[in-house]
């Protein structure tokens, strides 16, 4: 009779070889993790919205969806404020310049640049 350690080692090797098969690995269910999109923004897990089976609960479902979006975005209100429209001068004017007319006075003229 063989020493008891040989059958034990063979059994252990057999079990370890079976444990490494792809069929025994847990299947990945969908895209549940965090990822980056093509622009580099961090995207969270996929949000599964409740199914609307009846039209009586339509308002409650809409409120639930709004609450979900508020929780995800961290917004205290449903629509973010719209940015104000600015012209080119206002966009590139520096705060230390003050008046927008000062911006045109600080730009060097062509003849001054050519002289130097």
Curated annotation (Swiss-Prot):
InterPro entries: Galanin (IPR008174), GALP (IPR039244)
Compartments in which it is found: Secreted
Residues of the signal peptide: 1-24
GO MF annotation list: hormone activity
Domain of life: Eukaryota
Expression across tissues: Isoform 2 is found in ganglia of ganglioneuroma and ganglioneuroblastoma, as well as in differentiated tumor cells of neuroblastoma tissues. Not found in undifferentiated neuroblasts. Isoform 2 is found in the skin, in pericytes covering microvascular arterioles and venules on their abluminal surfaces. In larger vessels, isoform 2 is expressed in layers of smooth muscle cells. Isoform 2 is not detected in endothelial cells.
Protein's GO biological process: antimicrobial humoral immune response mediated by antimicrobial peptide; behavioral response to starvation; defense response to bacterium; defense response to Gram-negative bacterium; modulation of process of another organism; neuropeptide signaling pathway; regulation of appetite; response to insulin
Pro-peptide positions on chain: 87-116
Family: Belongs to the galanin family.
Record protein name field: Galanin-like peptide
Species for this entry: Homo sapiens (Human)
């Amino acid at each position: 009779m063989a020493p008891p350690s040989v059958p034990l080692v063979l059994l252990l090797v057999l079990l370890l070889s079976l444990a490494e098969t792809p069929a025994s690995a847990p299947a990945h269910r969908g895209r549940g993790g965090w990822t980056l999109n093509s622009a580099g923004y961090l995207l969270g897990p996929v949000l599964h919205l409740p199914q609307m089976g009846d039209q009586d609960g339509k308002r409650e479902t809409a409120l639930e969806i709004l609450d979900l979006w508020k929780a995800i975005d961290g917004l205290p209100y449903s629509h973010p404020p719209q940015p104000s429209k600015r012209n080119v001068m206002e966009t590139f004017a520096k705060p230390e310049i003050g008046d927008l007319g000062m911006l045109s006075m600080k730009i060097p003229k062509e003849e001054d640049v050519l002289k130097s």
